[in-house]
């Protein structure tokens, strides 16, 4: 059904998008996946210098390799999802499993004893991250009514602007315990959130059922 977007100031438009998401479980869950990724997942990047210098004794070269590993995985993930997106049998389930996989891979990386373990783990982290977040973005753009799409996408973009806060949290935990523990906890939170959402039949059905049908009650 047609959902008129009200004119108003920027704050009012933002709050309208926030209200829309808050009243729709599917879109709230998709935004939550991006939010948890920013606050607890990708915050690991802040701690990579510690891994390169203190744990792997590889200095700036190791730091560069760790960063590059994520980039390579992200590139492969982008190419993969672009190639097989229309052939994924269960898009919703695949998305949530990708998010859970990201958390588990971060936990694996956090305990990696050597660069030989850390680099492949980060390649897979980059792959999983891009693979599932591309799907999140696609479902939001396809499912949100035209009049509200910009407002909801602004919330999605806001999640990425919270990366520094995630880095601050990771840094504080690393200072209190250590960097391995900080990334382990972050990965566990990301995985737990995804696995919890995986129990929802509505989310697993994304891609089989038109997403707008899940939001028809909005007014």
Regions flagged by a language model, labelled:
Residues 1-32, 217-219:
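Juxtamembrane intracellular "pre-TM" segments in multi-pass secondary transporters
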Residues 30-31, 39-51:
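Short helix-kink/termination motifs in transmembrane helices of multi-pass secondary transporters
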């Amino acid at each position: 059904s047609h959902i008129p977007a009200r004119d108003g100031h920027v704050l009012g438009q933002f709050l309208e998008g926030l209200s829309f998401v808050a009243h729709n479980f599917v879109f709230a869950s998709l935004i939550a996946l991006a939010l948890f990724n920013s606050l607890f997942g990708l915050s690991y990047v802040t701690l990579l210098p510690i891994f390169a210098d203190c744990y792997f004794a590889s200095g700036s070269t190791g730091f560069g390799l760790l960063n590059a590993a994520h980039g390579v995985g992200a590139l492969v993930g982008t190419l993969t999802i672009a190639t097989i997106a229309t052939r994924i049998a269960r898009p919703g389930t695949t998305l949530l499993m990708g998010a859970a996989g990201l958390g588990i891979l971060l936990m694996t990386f956090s305990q990696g004893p050597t660069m030989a373990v850390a680099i492949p783990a980060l390649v897979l982290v980059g792959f999983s991250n891009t693979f599932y977040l591309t799907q999140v973005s696609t479902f939001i753009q396809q499912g949100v009514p035209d009049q509200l799409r910009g407002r909801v996408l602004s919330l999605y973009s806001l999640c990425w602007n919270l990366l520094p806060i995630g880095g601050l949290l990771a840094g504080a935990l690393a200072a209190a315990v250590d960097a391995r523990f900080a990334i382990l906890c972050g990965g566990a939170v990301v995985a737990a959130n995804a696995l919890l959402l995986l129990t929802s039949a509505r989310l697993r059905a994304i891609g089989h059922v038109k997403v707008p049908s899940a939001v028809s009650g909005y007014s």
